[in-house]
Design a protein with these regions (language model features):
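Multi-pass alpha-helical transmembrane bundle typical of ion/small-solute transporters
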Residues: 1-341
Length: 341
């Protein structure tokens, strides 16, 4: 019993480390545009984003956590070793792509890792098709939503302010971009911290501290300490952030002015709020990249650096299978040591 409790503690700690790395790796997306447009210095930008990552705990519910915890993998096939192997697979992939300066999705690395470990334990029957359908569909839909909204917002702003002096527009949108960056960071914290909450719920089930009925219920067991811990971890990760990726997101895809940064962040925030409330675990990276591309394309298609965007897309395509393979191998290694893992 003591060993089971120790393993649960280790699993929760690894989950919070993943959450921290999610902030370190992904939350750069929240500040890339506001840094690129020089509205905030990098140090102030990370503090701004971190605060709103944490504040999201009080606004966006637990719908995404429920999807991760019981909507994608048949929970009866989950053990603590599945959860920890899935987390480690995602962490390994996140660190590799951080080193390679690729803004891939920590969310999809987590989903891929969790699935890979579960499949290695119990076969492909553990997959819940309905949960995967909406997640896989939104791998495509989220960046398209971001692109479309960014394009529409940018065109609308150009039309509404067509007779205003460019310098005055720049002053206005420097102020407004503080709000859009805050909104995007709120959406990021609300969507991504919940994924860690869902994984913690799976670990509690695997350790038999939670029944399947409780997992399927109203999640009254998700007390505030767990919610606050998940949001605090991602906020700290943001604060200590991933500057290698900020450079790629904020300046190498397209050059942005404050009006473009505002439109991209607002488009991303709208997408993240709507999907978080609907319980769809989307990628913040996909979303903001689509929005930046949409904004850049309003000037001219050549303003978008398609070579960089293409490299990023390839990293997206590889994320779920790569993290799944790493996690499956880790679970296989666990089984060599503990056959009933």
């Amino acid at each position: 019993m003591k060993s089971d409790l120790l393993l649960l503690v280790i699993t929760v700690v690894v989950a919070l480390i993943f959450d921290f790395l999610n902030g370190f790796h992904d939350a750069a997306n929240s500040i890339a545009t506001v840094v690129s447009t020089r509205v905030l210095s990098p140090k102030l930008a990370v503090l701004w984003a971190a605060v709103f990552n944490f504040v999201a705990a009080f606004f966006l519910g637990t719908a995404v956590a429920k999807t991760i915890g019981r909507g994608m993998i048949r929970i009866e096939s989950v053990s603590q070793y599945v959860v920890i192997a899935g987390l480690l697979g995602a962490i390994v992939w996140d660190l590799l792509t951080w080193w390679w300066r690729l803004p891939t999705s920590s969310s999809h690395a987590l989903i891929g890792g969790y699935a890979g470990a579960a499949i290695m334990r119990a076969g492909f029957g553990v997959i819940i098709p309905e949960g995967w359908h909406k997640t896989l569909i939104f791998i495509v839909v989220a960046p398209i939503m971001g692109l479309f909204l960014g394009l529409v917002l940018m065109v609308s702003v150009f039309w509404l302010l067509r007779n205003k002096a460019p310098r005055r527009i720049d002053v206005w949108f420097r102020r407004l971009q503080l709000l859009s960056a805050a909104a995007y960071s709120l959406g990021h914290g609300g969507n991504d911290a919940q994924k860690t909450m869902g994984i913690v719920a799976s670990a509690l089930y695997g350790a038999k501290y939670l029944t399947s009925a409780e997992l399927a219920g109203n999640w009254g067991h998700f007390h505030w300490p767990i919610i606050l811990a998940a949001h605090a971890a991602i906020a700290l990760g943001t604060y200590f952030g991933g500057w290698r990726i900020v450079h790629t997101m904020g300046s190498r895809i397209t050059k942005l002015k404050p009006v473009g940064g505002f439109c991209a962040e607002t488009a991303g925030a709208i997408t993240l709020f709507s999907t978080a409330l609907a319980g769809i675990p989307v990628s913040t990276t996909h979303t903001i990249t689509g929005a930046i591309v949409g904004v850049g394309a309003t000037t001219r298609l050549s303003a978008v650096r398609w070579g960089v965007a293409r490299r990023i897309v390839w990293a997206w395509i590889l994320t779920i299978p790569a993290s799944a393979i790493v996690a499956a191998l880790l679970f296989w290694a666990f089984r060599l040591v503990k056959p009933d893992a």
